């Protein structure tokens, strides 16, 4: 089978899939650093015959896949491009294909993102409400087979990220500065609480 990982990041999911299944995995990213790292890891692990990393936009792809996954990328698509995103997923999927889209979301009605996060952490980022995602999925001709809602799982993830951030405080300050470190410590702590007590969840659409 052929698997596509949209927004493959540092390649961990694509590598795990290639290791555990007899399939060909294509991972795409817009980051030159991530692309270089993924290429290096595929060679180190002797998985070059199964892994194919590309430095490109998902909208430029033009081939068919049995499975499509995307983890942590949809938050960067932008509301006005949701229809285009799912239309492209529909175009790239084989007739009997399955897609899994994993994204942070909100249990509240649609609203503008927090201005502090937009300015300092994720310019252009957006966490959608459920209603904002299901409609473009349907309009793209895809079928929603399952929606899983995860909340507390991600609060634990954020807690670990925050702890790792604090452990590496001096390294981070050397790479950037103390202001950068304090912003990210504040951001991770706030997001941990938003998942634990607030309106933030993780949606997995199949």
Task: Give, region by region, the residue ranges found by the protein language model.
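A short acidic, Gly/Pro-enriched loop at the edge of an enzyme's catalytic core
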Residues: 59-68
């Amino acid at each position: 089978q052929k698997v596509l990982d949209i927004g493959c990041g540092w390649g961990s999911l694509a590598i795990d899939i290639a290791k555990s299944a007899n399939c060909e995995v294509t991972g795409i990213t817009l980051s030159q650093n991530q692309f270089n790292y993924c290429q290096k890891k595929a060679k180190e692990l002797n998985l070059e015959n199964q892994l194919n990393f590309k430095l490109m936009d998902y909208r430029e792809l033009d081939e068919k896949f049995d499975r499509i996954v995307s983890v942590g990328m949809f938050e960067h698509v932008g509301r006005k491009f949701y229809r285009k995103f799912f239309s492209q997923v529909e175009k790239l999927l084989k007739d009997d294909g399955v897609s899994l889209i994993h994204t942070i979301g909100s249990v509240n009605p649609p609203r503008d993102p927090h201005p502090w996060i937009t300015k300092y952490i994720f310019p252009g980022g957006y966490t959608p409400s459920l209603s904002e995602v299901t409609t473009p999925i349907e309009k793209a001709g895809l079928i929603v087979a399952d929606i899983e809602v995860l909340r507390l799982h991600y609060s634990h993830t954020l807690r670990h990220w925050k702890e790792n951030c604090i452990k590496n405080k001096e390294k981070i300050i050397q790479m950037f500065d103390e202001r950068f470190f304090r912003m990210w410590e504040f951001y991770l702590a706030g997001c941990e609480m938003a998942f634990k007590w607030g309106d933030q969840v993780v949606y997995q659409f199949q």
